[in-house]
C-alpha cells in the first residue's frame, strides 16, 4: 500500500458511492513561520512577535496562587478573523498554568495566563501559540 503522504495535494479519488477523497497539504508551519520572544519588565508586558507560530517566554515575576494575568501580543501575522490557539510550553512547572487566547484583532491578540497551583510561582513559563487562518479567500 502506498504511503498516504506520497499523494500530492489536490489529488482526488472518486469512489463507486460518489464520495470523494481529497489529499490535503501537511498541516503545520515550517521554520520560516516560527518566531520567539521573551517578555520584558513583567508578566503583563506587551510582546511583539510577527509569526504564524512560536513560543513566548514570560517574565519570571511572581504570580500568586489562583491569579490571572493578561498581556497583549502584537503580531502582524494575525487577521481579525483568525483563530489563535495557545498552550503551556515546556518552560515552567508542568500543568501549573492555564493558558488561553481570549481576544483576537487585526495584528493583535490577548493572552490570559492563570496560576492554577496552591502557591505563588516565580518562573519564566513558556507559551506555545499558532495562528489558524480562517479567511474565506
Identify what each model region corresponds to:
Residues 2-78, 104-137:
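Extracellular receptor-binding modules and their adjoining Ser/Thr/Gly/Asp/Asn-rich linkers
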